[in-house]
């Protein structure tokens, strides 16, 4: 059988012996992760030890990709930020930090807890080795040192259940409340954006191996047997991480087709069952269709393609994220976007970080991706001249598990790098005019002014005609950002430009405005207008973060493509909630990403849900603007209310709208990402009006 390159041999870490239970053999080399959550269990500990050993041996042999964390250990002579600090990796938990912040003279551990755990487990391992008659070794083995692949693998398969502290369902709870992409795509003949369009997701650069017609071994759900059995299926259609499969033997009969996520445990390359002594059994519906199934399969498999043998291992490796719970960093202040605040990483899901503000309450959080331009290493604000909130008051967080586990500051290498800038020959100046995406209304591109030029290419920008006079609505963009544009960009690309508030001359003309304000436009040569061949097309479906409520990921559609700029429409919501994002934004994901990571996906809803609560609203029109998106996940607790797209700072009007127990508004700022120099053509086809089914709003379960 023909296979993609690099699939000739199975990884050496794959166990060959037969398991007692059929669900133990996951990822072609990683055992069951069911007991991952019970770290005190001896069975889990034994597995973690064995997995860590096998993983290390394979990595030394060059068979497994090196994780981001291991890259630091080989660069321990490099300075982190030019201050002479050296990176260090904790030998117990694998966290990355600076040597000066680590515990003990040897700087081998990030905390006294890790040091004691390592010492205790080393002694246990030594005693166990002697009892087994093994000679003592110089390098002690740590019994409870969990392999990264085990942890991420456990999360990848959503073995855990429950909710985060902010009420967001995860794991199986999220999948139960989830959304059926397969039915949605098939019923309306929608097309999903390919995984290869998203450079921040697992295996984006290898998804070309997944194609129509390829064969896989998949769990047979149409069998009445005491154990799990498998059968061969053909990929009929690929939609993001999800594929439409048809069991071999049904031929042209599509009545039993089913959707499956390729990142799940039950899909394997051809040959996996033979290697792992699993049984291939045809579905009960067609069991009597052929008498010689072996000959039939041989004919069907000749010349076909399958998944790489290490597909799931690479999937797990690509989901190793260097950020860990307890790392400190600087993040934009959601209540005042012109400054940053200190925060601590609380949760990492699929590269998305839930951050807790150090000077806030235990539920004062902020969600963003680890590649977001809104987060920075500690000291960034002071270095570039950006404002930061300094508070003498620090809330008592001793009871909070995240703040009890603060290890160290996140090192600069963990953050997305920005493009180097050269200011010779003219640079941005204060007072220059330009066009920019409004971070408080991401569906609008506005006339803006450079208010301050910071170091390292950063700019403080404000929207002309804004309500603030003290600079509290300024926001920071890097000069290479694709969220800022030269004057006349909107005019040239037929995009509606939002004029300054109070500007009466219609239509807006840049020449007239510059003359009236006695200002000049920023030179077009200073903007980064590179456009890669991103592959997005109008009408493609994806999963997108609602940046005004960034803990929500919703079903969305690419409404318009302008060079590398995408207009994202949230299915079921009004156009006023549309958002402009860059084609390489880390806040958009392929179909099936939420299912892959165990995150809850918000389904489309009707524009006017028929619910009893709606009948109680006296000002329905305004209520829709402020409270509509919040109804996607009613929180178990009183949550800060995120506004709609038009008026993000109207706290005084909340009582008039009938909102109970209002709290300070949460403002989510810029949606930008680092760029690469490529060339692509302009796609400006109009957006179709897509029919949307009426779906019920999914609600969180209270713990």
Swiss-Prot record:
One of its GO terms (molecular function) is histone binding. Residues 619-634 have a biased composition (Basic residues). This is Lethal(3)malignant brain tumor-like protein 2. Residues 1-85, 604-649, 675-703 are annotated as: Disordered. Part of the E2F6.com-1 complex in G0 phase composed of E2F6, MGA, MAX, TFDP1, CBX3, BAT8, EUHMTASE1, RING1, RNF2, MBLR, BAT8 and YAF2. There is a cross-link at residues 405, 647, 673, 698 (Glycyl lysine isopeptide (Lys-Gly) (interchain with G-Cter in SUMO2)). Residues 73-82 have a biased composition (Polar residues). There is a cross-link at residue 698 (Glycyl lysine isopeptide (Lys-Gly) (interchain with G-Cter in SUMO1)). The keyword Transcription applies. Residues 15-25, 50-60 have a biased composition (Acidic residues). Ubiquitous. The keyword Ligase does not apply. A zinc finger (FCS-type) spans 81-116. It comes from Mus musculus (Mouse). Gene3D superfamilies: 2.30.30.140, 3.30.60.160. MBT repeats lie at residues 179-283, 291-391, 397-500, 508-604. Keywords: Chromatin regulator, Isopeptide bond, Metal-binding, Nucleus, Phosphoprotein, Repeat, Transcription, Transcription regulation, Ubl conjugation, Zinc, Zinc-finger. It is found in: Nucleus.
